[in-house]
Amino acid sequence: MDEYRELISVLPLDTVEYAFAYGSGAIQQKDENKAEKMVDFVVVTKDAQEFHKANIAKNPQHYSLLRLLGPKMLEKIQCNFAARVYYNTHVNVGKRKIKYGIISYENVKQDLLDWRWIYISGRLHKPVLDVIKPKDDMCDLVTENRRSALHSALLLLPESFTLKQLFHQIVGLSYTGDFRMIVGEDKNKIMKIVEGNYEELMRVYEPLMNDDARLSVMSPAKVIQDGSTTAIYHRLNLLPSEVLNQIQKNMNKAQKRQRDAEEVIFSLAHRHDVAATVETAIGGIIRPISFSQTAKNAFSAGMTRSVIYSLAKMSKFLKSK
């Protein structure tokens, strides 16, 4: 942990509420050497403009030529497009390379509670390293986000399954509809995360499973959930608002009717295509964001860094085929 704190200490941290490291450079994945990987960070700030102002003064080399636009314009680029994250990538700190994304507290709150973009919220479905510890309000947001991930995964599973199957669904949620899983990402990524982080996933999700009255963990090989219409209706109602909005929009469009969310959810709970409907809704949020945020990342990184990063991703993809 000290290594990661040292890496992020090059940034101005006065406005930072929370920072975590994620990805294969910080969290062990099966058959991967994390010491060789670039370390990914997310930094949550209460004042994006002030963060960029201080960071440009301290670390101008972290930015592309966009820094010349000034901190006010960088804040606008960050907070008004795609998943509301601004990334600096391929930054050299000592012997390691880091990439860090900056997001405002208000935007991360929106993503964790409502799944507005399923971007930072998706990264926090999985185990991360808390480099700057979150305060109580942020802890509550992260827990609620993971509870939503558990409900979503359970709606995609049958009445009986294994813990490994559950974790596979949870980890896979944020890749649903992501075009990078077709081109640019390791095809075995989800499996590697689950295999390399089983104990951490258990630590994160066991308390949430214990709190769920409609779920029984008999053993790692046998988990049973209540598959009644009442239980499904209950879980559907606990999904984040953006997922419910997508479900309502998709079902009304398919049936050429205009019904309110409550009526749509009640109807869905009685159908046999709940899993497919929920998965389609989640993918409908992630798909456009995966395109727009990738384009934004390339824009903020500049041409040279974007080409280097894309080539590294493509190499990883080809090795996994």
From Swiss-Prot:
Keyword vocabulary terms for this entry: Lipid biosynthesis, Lipid metabolism, Magnesium, Membrane, Mitochondrion, Mitochondrion inner membrane, Nucleotidyltransferase, Phospholipid biosynthesis, Phospholipid metabolism, Transferase
A molecular-function term among this protein's GO annotations: phosphatidate cytidylyltransferase activity
Annotated compartments: Mitochondrion inner membrane
Family from the record: Belongs to the TAM41 family.
Cofactor(s) of this protein: Mg(2+); Co(2+); Cu(2+)
EC number(s) reported in the record: 2.7.7.41
Details of cofactor binding: Magnesium. Also active with cobalt or copper.
InterPro entries: Tam41
Bilayer topology annotation: Peripheral membrane protein
A Pfam family of this chain: Tam41_Mmp37
Pathway membership: Phospholipid metabolism; CDP-diacylglycerol biosynthesis; CDP-diacylglycerol from sn-glycerol 3-phosphate: step 3/3
Reaction(s) this enzyme catalyzes, per UniProt: a 1,2-diacyl-sn-glycero-3-phosphate + CTP + H(+) = a CDP-1,2-diacyl-sn-glycerol + diphosphate
EC top class, as a word: transferase
Biological process according to GO: cardiolipin biosynthetic process; CDP-diacylglycerol biosynthetic process
Organism: Caenorhabditis briggsae
Protein name, as recorded: Phosphatidate cytidylyltransferase, mitochondrial
